[in-house]
C-alpha cells in the first residue's frame, strides 16, 4: 500500500536548483497566503534545497523584496 503523500511528492533528480533572492515570483510560489514558508513535505524539495530556499526567502524579506506577512494579516 503506497502512501498518498509519497505519490504526490515532486522529485527533483539531476536538476540544479538555485533560488535567487531577487526572483520575487519564484519565491512567492513557496510562501502561503499568510506569508509562511511552505514545508518540505508539501514542496517536495530535498533538505538541502529547502535550506537554500529558506535562506533566500529570509534574505529577500530582509531586503524588503517580499513582505514578512501578507497585507490582510497586518
From Swiss-Prot:
Keywords recorded for this protein, A-Z: Ribonucleoprotein, Ribosomal protein, RNA-binding, rRNA-binding
An MF annotation (GO) of this entry: structural constituent of ribosome
GO terms classed as biological process: translation
Keyword match Iron: no
GO cellular component: cytosolic small ribosomal subunit
InterPro entries: Ribosomal_bS18 (IPR001648), Ribosomal_bS18_sf (IPR036870)
SUPFAM superfamilies: Ribosomal protein S18
Protein origin, superkingdom: Bacteria
Purpose of the protein: Binds as a heterodimer with protein bS6 to the central domain of the 16S rRNA, where it helps stabilize the platform of the 30S subunit.
PANTHER family assigned: 30S RIBOSOMAL PROTEIN S18, SMALL RIBOSOMAL SUBUNIT PROTEIN BS18M
HAMAP family reported for this sequence: Ribosomal_bS18
Entry similarity comment: Belongs to the bacterial ribosomal protein bS18 family.
Subunit structure: Part of the 30S ribosomal subunit. Forms a tight heterodimer with protein bS6.
Protein name as annotated: Small ribosomal subunit protein bS18
Species the sequence originates in: Chlorobaculum tepidum (strain ATCC 49652 / DSM 12025 / NBRC 103806 / TLS) (Chlorobium tepidum)
Lineage: Bacteria, Pseudomonadati, Chlorobiota, Chlorobiia, Chlorobiales
